UniProtKB/Swiss-Prot annotation:
This is Bomanin Short 2. Residues 1-20 form the signal peptide. It holds the Pfam family DIM. Hemolymph (at protein level). The modification Glycine amide is found at G43. It comes from Drosophila melanogaster. Secreted immune-induced peptide induced by Toll signaling. Has a role in resistance to bacterial and fungal infections. Transmembrane segments: none annotated. GO terms for biological process: defense response; innate immune response; response to bacterium.
Amino acid sequence: MKFFSVVTVFVFGLLALANAVPLSPDPGNVVINGDCKYCNVHGGK
């Protein structure tokens, strides 16, 4: 049962990461909640 909980947490972590990083064609052109003046957003890893 502990293995199942670890896998569940891992899957939800991947889903959260996928939602946090938009899969846009141009990773360098990411605008979050309107105009982003002081953002430090880096495309890629």
